[in-house]
Every structure is written in C-alpha cells, then in structure tokens.
Swiss-Prot record:
Molecular-function GO terms, alphabetical: ATP binding; identical protein binding; phosphoprotein phosphatase activity; phosphorelay sensor kinase activity; protein homodimerization activity
One Pfam family named in its UniProt record: HAMP
Response regulatory domain residues: 683-798
Domain HAMP: 354-407
Designated name of the protein: Sensor protein TorS
Family matches, as NCBIfam families: PRK11466.1, TMAO_torS
Organism: Escherichia coli (strain K12)
Modifications made to the protein after synthesis: Activation requires a sequential transfer of a phosphate group from a His in the primary transmitter domain, to an Asp in the receiver domain and to a His in the secondary transmitter domain.
Effect of H408L: In torS729; partial activation
Length: 914
C-alpha cells in the first residue's frame, strides 16, 4: 500500500494518542476512586475528631466557669460567668447532636449534661440570692454605723454642755466661799457632784456605748457569724439596752427625741444578723453543689473520653480503607505504564523508524552527495513513500538546473574578473592621492617643526644673552635697550607659539593639550593684569580689575591656557586703545564662570564681529598682529568646554567675554614658591651642538652653583661619561650631528641606568612627542627658557629640595616650642614616627586593592597628624588624597621630606639652646 509520509506519521501519532488517552482514562478513574475514598474519610473523620476536641474543651470551660461562678462577689462577674455557662452548655448540646447525627451513641453524655445544667442553674440562682443578701447587709450595716455615730456625736455635745455648766457652778462655789456663805457653798457643791458631774459621766457612757455598737457592727463578718452568732447577738443586745437607758437621762428634750429616733435604726441589728445567717446557709449550700459538680464533671469527662476512643477507632478503619485504595491505584498505574511503554516502542519501530526515519536518512545521504558535487549519484528506493518519490523527481530537475547554473556562473566569473581589475586601478589611484595629501600634511608639519627649531634656537641666544647682559652692572645705561631686545624676542616667541597652536588646531586639535588641575582664579587674573601693566607706562590708559566677592577660592581647569586667552584679550585691548580704560572683570553666572575684558578703544564694526574669530582676519592692518590670536583663543575656549564672544560699538569700545564651566575645586591648590634655586655641587652634562646655546646655558646654570660639562655630539657624550666622574643628570638636545637625541637617550638609559635624562630642545613639544619620550626622559625643557625657570625645572625633575623650611609651618612650630618646649615636639615626632608613618604602608596596600574607604580613613588620620606638627604641605596632600583616594598623588615623599626637615629644625633648636 503506497501511503503518503503524512498519513504514516498521522497513523503513528494516532496510535500514540489513543494509548495516551487510554492511560489517562485509567489513571483518572483510579485517582477519582482514591479521591472519593479520601473525601468520604475526610468528611467523616476530621469533623468527628474536631467535634470530640471541641467537646472536651467546652466541658473544661464549663467546669472553669462553674468554679468562678461560686466565687463571684459582684453582679457583673455573676452575669458574665452565667453567660459563659449558657454558651458552653449550648455548644455541648450542639456538638452532641452533631455526633448523634454521625451515628454515635451520646445518650449517657446527654443525661450527664442535663444533670450538670440543672445543678449549675441552681448554683447560679443561689449566687444571685447571696449577692442580694450581701447588698442588703452592706446597706443596713452602713445605716446602723451612721446611726451609732450620730448618737455618739449627740452624746458628746451633751457631755460638753454639762461640763460647761459644772464649770460655772464651780466658779460660783468659789464666790460663795469668798463671801463666807458656807451653807450655800455646800449646797452648790452637792449639786455639782450629784447632778452635773453625774450627768457628764452618763453622757460619756452613752457616747462610748454608741461607739462600741458601731465597732461591733463594722467588725461583723460571715466567718464570725458562722462561729459565734449567739454571742454576737447577745453583746449587741446589751449594748443597745445601755443606749436606751442612757437616752432617757438626756435632759434636752430635742436631743433626747433625736437620739430615740436614731436608736430605732440601731435596733435593726437583729435584721442584720439574720441576713448574715442566710448568707452563711447559702454559702454552705453552694459549697455542697460545687463538690457535686466536680463529681459530675469527672463522670462527664469519662463519658467524653469513651466517645473519643470510639471516634479514633472509626478513623483507623477509614485510613486502612484509604491505604488499600491507594495501593490498588498504584499497581494498576504501574501495569498500565509497562503496557503503554511496550506499545509505544512497537509503534516507533514499525511506523516511525521503518516507514519514515530510515527512508529519510537514505534520502538525506543521497542529497549530501549531491551537495558535495556528486551530481550524478543515484537516489535510493523510496519504499513506496509518495513524498520521497516526489523528492527524487525534484532532484533530477535539480541536476539539470545545476548544470545550467554552472555554465552561467562561468560567464559571471569572467565579468567579475573584469570589474575587479577596474576597481583595483581606482583603489591604486585613490591610495596615491591620499598618500600625496598625507605627504603634504607631513611636509607642512615638518616645515613648521623645522621652522620652530630654527627660530627658537637663535631666540634662545637672543633672550639668554639679553638676560645675562642685564645682570651686568656695567651695562645699566643700556638696560632699556636690553629690555627692548627682550620684549622683541618674547613677542617673536609669542607669534611663533600662536602659529604652532593654530597649526595644531587646524590639524584637528589632536596636539592641543588641555589640563585639568586646581588653581586660584583671583591671583591668576591679578598676576596676568600685572604683567600687562608695564605696557601702559606713559600712556593715558587705566588698568583695573573687578572681581566679584562671591568668586570661589579655587576652580578646576587649565590655568596656563586660561592665562593665554586672557593675555591675548588684554594685548588686543592695549593695541586698539589709545586712551581711557581697560577693565578685567570676573564673576559667576549659574554654572558658568565669566571673564570679561572691556576697553574704551576704537571699537569694531558689528558687521565684522563674526569675522574676527577667523584666522588671519584683522580689524585694522595699522595695529599690527598676526590675526591668529582671537582664532586660537576661541578654539582654546571650546577645547576647555566654553566659548568666547564679543560685543562692540564703534568709537566707544569693545567687550570680549570668556565663558567657562564653573567647577569648584575640592582639592587644595599646590603652593608655588618663586625663589632662586641653588644647584650647588650638582654635576650636569650638557649635550648641545650649538656653541651659543652651550655658552648661554652654562652661564645661566653657573649662577645657581652647578658644575656644567658641555659636549657637542653623541660620541663626545659617551666618551665623557666613560672617562669622567659620575653626573647627576644629562641635558640632551634632540638634534645632534651624528645621531638624534632620542636614540642617544636610549643608549644612555641602557648603559647608565642611574643617570637622569632631561630633554633640552627647541622642537615643538606636543603630546605625541611627550608620549614617545616619556619612558626615556624625566622631563623636557623647551628652548628658549628663562634662567629662573631653567633652575626650577631642573630642581623639579631631579626632585631636589629648594628649601626644607617650605615643607614646615615654622611660625606654628615656634609658637608650640615657646608654649610647650622642644622636648614635647620631640615626643610628638617619636609618636608620629611610630603610629603615623605605618599608615603609609596601609595606603599602599589599600591603593593596590582599590579600597577607597580605607585610604580615606588613613589619609584623614595622617592629615591631622601632619597638621599638628606643622607639615602643612603634607597635610594638604593628605586632604587631597582623602577627597580623591584612587587618583590623587601619594604624600609619601613629602612626608619623608617634612620629617627630615622637622628633625633638622629640632636639631638647630637644640644647638641654639646649648
């Protein structure tokens, strides 16, 4: 039978689906049976267990409430316990009814519950009666106590009156005795004794009897009544009789009537005793009921326990039934799974493998041979599969198409080869054009570099000679001429630098370097204006600054480039201002720093304002200049993230505004000390082929105490180093007659590793040159260079110490020594060496592991320690390290230098003290 591949697969899948459906139905039936058994057991067992537990809890609560009911001493507690008993009784009855509906025999428990309920109702009624009796006892007792107190008060009043009367009679007796009326005095004395004093005693007895009755009533209690009721009644009866007898002897009719009325209330003591007697009887009855309740509850608990045992037995039977049903379901599912697995294997082998998989594998191998290039390979038998027959016919058609495509591909290959040859010719032409452009650019750069070198070298001779001549006292008369030579040379150097900056900007700005360091804006502006002040001498021009008070003390940026831009703006203002003023302003505007140069010069036509920032554009050719200053300044402002703009009014003046991002510096500004550098005893090797440059450099360095040996080429340098004493450093010119300076530096670095190499060149020192020579030279000194700058750069590159006292705040140390003595500073230095210096090792370890928090803590401790010992530069470096723990320079060298300086300062102090 020639079935299609789809039908064969459908047949196999249908058989597997039927097998899956059968397994599902059998499994569903077993699970449903187990679920039904579990449901029946759950519905029957769990509720009965819960009801048994609730029944036990309810009986316990009922017993607890019954005990509390007996001891209830107020109506609120009595009602609360009664409600609890009622609720628990109803709950027990409901649970018993539910258990009875489940088929349990609860007759004995119900009868026991009925007896307990009757006993509890009787107990509740007795407790209520007892509460009423005690309320009546309290009210009657309070009335009797109040009446007795009133009698005592009235008796006290009568006694006081009688005492007053007796006092008057006594006074009269004394008068009669003085009048010698003996008989009258004796008669008055008899009356005093027989009547007045006797009456006082009777009233006092009345008061005491009333207080005794009051005390007896107040001391009455249930326990006393139960023990000695007849005696208490007799004592109260005697006391009341005394009160009644003394009441008759009261002379005042009104008081006597009032006491008689009050005695009526006191006479109700017998009723009070009767109430206490009833209370005692009820309490005894309640005690008997409580004991009976305990016995009944014990019997009730026994019946409940038997019921719980019955429930547990039924639950065990239900669980056993559930386990049997579960086991039967597991066995049936296991058997069905094995049968299904066998049937599935048979279906996969017979339908899928023989009819589908194996023919497809053979067909795939044939197709792979076809793809590998064996186009004439035969196809296997299709085993009567319609789709595979179709694939065979398609492959025959594919063979024909492949032969046609091969012929077409050969034709296309010939066309592509021709086109490729044409493209290669175009690429060669393009490369030649680009090479010519690059060659022209390199020639331009080489020309500028050569011109820079050729101009800077004689400029160094001019400026250096002028500076040396200016130091000669014999030439004071020609000082103005020397100043003119120096100014002209510096102007020429400025023009040369402008041309080089413009060349770098025109090349895309790759060689225009902009630094980012902290600086102080106010001193920078003031010093720049001060440098320009010499150019206004003898001219009617006023230079002024207007720096806002809210200017930050320190900013981040490139102070050298900012000074260059401002100097250019001030130079233009001086060039175009004949008289009036030039004001340098500085202020902040939001997140920007504004520097303005305003003048009262000739002004600029508004139509030309847009052109003045273009290269080689001049407002007036009569004023001089190259026309590059504003172009360079504008591009430098852009490189620093700002802009340069201008406003002007002809014949009024102009205002140029430099806008830069306002970034307040968090690190301290390094302090610079402008003083002469001493290089005493320092041996330097000068490798320079220009004799004039040699002579000027030697003369400049001799004034600082250095020992200079000059050679003219690389061979002489190598010979001198080999035959002479060691040199501290070598100044290497880049252009030497035999080999270039960089190649010589590589040889010197290999042969003399301890020799410090310093570049000394008139070449353009751009970023590319610095990167090429950074591994060879400690630094590069450009020519021309002033004498002071030359000495400072040498000291910097050689890491010399200009003045040890610069590392210390001497005034602070002097004050501390005056207040506490140098011995204390010695102790501080020892503590600093023991505890602070080890922090430097911790900083190195933390810097290696990039642990910024640990660096901050150590830097903060070092900052405080350095500040306390007057090491102000080291303290600033530590503060900078605390702010920038992973990028700031390390203070190790400065701290070592400061410790040495402090030791020298202390040694000097000790010598002075001796």
């Amino acid at each position: 039978m020639n079935l299609t591949l789809t039908r064969r697969l459908w047949m196999g899948f249908a058989l597997m689906a039927l097998l899956t459906l059968t397994s599902t139905l059998v499994g569903w039936y077993n699970l449903r049976f187990i679920s039904q058994v579990e449901k029946d057991n759950t519905q029957a067992l769990i509720p009965t267990m819960n009801m048994a537990r609730q029944l036990s809890e309810a009986s316990a609560w009922e017993l607890f409430a019954a005990q509390n009911l007996t001891s209830a001493d107020n109506e609120k507690m009595w009602q609360a316990q009664g409600r609890m008993l009622t609720a628990q009784s109803l709950k027990i009855n409901a649970l018993l009814q539910a258990l009875r509906e489940q088929g349990f025999d609860t007759t004995a428990i119900e009868q026991q519950e009925q007896e307990i309920s009757r006993s509890l109702r009787q107990q509740g009624e007795l407790v209520g009666q007892r509460l009423q009796l005690r309320q009546q006892q309290q009210q009657l007792s309070q009335q009797i106590v109040a009446a007795a107190d009133e009698i005592a008060r009235l008796a006290q009043g009568q006694a006081n009156n009688a005492t007053t009367s007796a006092g008057a009679t006594q006074a009269g007796i004394y008068d009669l005795i003085e009048q010698d009326q003996r008989q009258a005095a004796e008669s008055a004395l008899d009356r005093l004794i027989d009547i007045d004093l006797e009456y006082v005693n009777q009233m006092n007895e009345l008061r005491l009897s009333a207080l005794r009755v009051q005390q007896m009533v107040m001391n009455l209690g249930l326990e006393q009544i139960q023990k000695n009721a007849p005696t208490l009644e007799k004592q109260l009866n005697n006391a009341v009789k005394i009160l009644q007898r003394r009441q008759i002897r009261i002379e005042d009719p009104g008081v006597r009537a009032q006491v008689a009325t009050t005695l009526t209330t006191v006479s109700q003591y017998s009723d009070l005793l009767a109430l206490y007697q009833q209370d005692s009887e009820i309490s005894n009855h309640l005690q008997t009921l409580a004991q009976n309740n305990i016995a009944q509850f014990a019997q009730f608990s026994s019946e409940v326990s038997q019921l719980v045992d019955t429930i547990e037995l039924r639950n065990q039977h239900g669980l056993a039934h559930l386990e049997k049903a579960s086991a039967r379901g597991q066995y049936s599912l296991l058997l069905l799974g094995m049968v299904s697995l066998c049937a599935l294997i048979l279906i996969l082998w017979r339908v899928v493998y023989r009819s589908v998989t194996r023919p497809l594998a053979e067909q795939t191998q044939a197709l792979q041979r076809l793809l590998d290039g064996d186009i004439d390979s035969p196809f296997p038998e299709t085993a009567g599969v319609r789709e595979l027959d179709t694939i065979g016919r398609l492959m025959d058609a594919f063979r024909s198409n492949v032969h046609a495509l091969n012929r077409h591909r050969e034709q296309l290959a010939a066309q592509v080869k021709a086109r490729t040859a044409e493209l290669q010719e175009l690429v060669i032409e393009h490369r030649q054009a680009r090479a010519e452009a690059e060659k022209a650019s390199q020639a331009k750069s080489a020309f500028l570099a050569a011109m820079s070198h050729e101009i800077r070298t004689p400029l160094y001779g001019i400026l250096g000679t002028a500076q040396l001549l200016a130091d000669n006292p014999a030439l004071n008369a020609q000082r103005d001429d020397l100043r003119a030579i120096t100014d002209s040379g510096e102007s020429l150097l400025t023009i040369l630098n402008d041309i080089l900056d413009y060349s770098a900007i025109e090349a895309g700005g790759k060689n225009v370097s902009v630094s980012d360091e902290p600086f102080e804006p106010r001193p920078l502006l003031e010093s720049t204006l001060q440098l320009m002040s010499g150019r206004v001498k003898g001219r009617p021009i006023r230079l002024a600054t207007a720096i806002a008070d809210d200017m930050p003390c320190a900013l981040m940026g490139d102070p050298r480039r900012i000074r260059q831009v401002i100097t250019n703006l001030l130079s233009n203002a001086l060039r175009f201002t004949d008289e009036g003023y030039i004001i340098l302003r500085s202020r902040t505007d939001g997140e920007q720093w504004l520097v303005e140069v305003e003048d009262s010069g000739c002004g600029i036509d508004p139509a030309k304002l847009a052109e003045i920032f273009q290269p080689f554009v001049q407002v007036s050719g009569k004023r001089g200049g190259t026309g590059l200053g504003l172009t360079i300044s504008s591009r430098l402002a852009q490189a620093m993230g700002g802009e340069l703009s201008a406003t002007s009014t002809p014949e009024v003046g102009s205002c140029f505004c430099l806008r830069l991002p306002l970034r307040v510096a968090t690190a301290p500004v390094p302090k610079t000390v402008n003083q002469a550098v001493r290089l005493d005893g320092l041996r330097l090797l000068l490798i320079e082929d220009n004799p004039l440059t040699q002579r000027i450099t030697i003369e400049m360095l001799k004034t600082s105490g250095a020992q200079i040996v000059a050679v003219g080429n690389a061979a002489q340098a190598l010979e001198t180093l080999q035959n002479s004493e060691p040199f501290a450093a070598a100044l290497v010119d880049f252009d030497l007659p035999d080999i270039d300076g960089i190649t010589l530096a590589r040889q010197l670095a290999q042969q003399y590793p301890s020799l410090v190499l310093i570049g000394f060149s008139a070449h353009v020192i751009d970023e590319t040159l610095r990167q090429r020579t950074s591994s060879l030279f400690r630094g590069i000194i450009p020519k021309p260079v002033p004498r002071e700058v030359l000495g400072q750069l040498l000291a910097h590159y050689l890491q010399l110490q200009v003045n040890n006292d610069q590392s210390l705040d001497v005034s602070q140390l002097n004050e501390d020594a005056q207040l506490m003595g140098t011995e204390k500073i010695h102790e501080w230095l020892v503590l600093f060496t023991q505890h602070a210096l080890p922090l430097l090792d911790e900083i190195d370890i933390a810097r290696a592991s990039q642990d910024s928090e640990k660096i901050k803590r150590a830097a903060h401790q070092l900052k405080s320690s350095c500040s306390s010992l007057g090491m102000h530069i080291a303290s600033q470096l530590c503060a900078q390290l605390e702010q920038q723990p992973l990028s700031a320079p390390l203070p190790h060298e400065e701290i070592t230098r400061s410790v040495a300086a402090l030791e020298a300062w202390l040694h000097k102090k000790d010598l002075n003290a001796i």
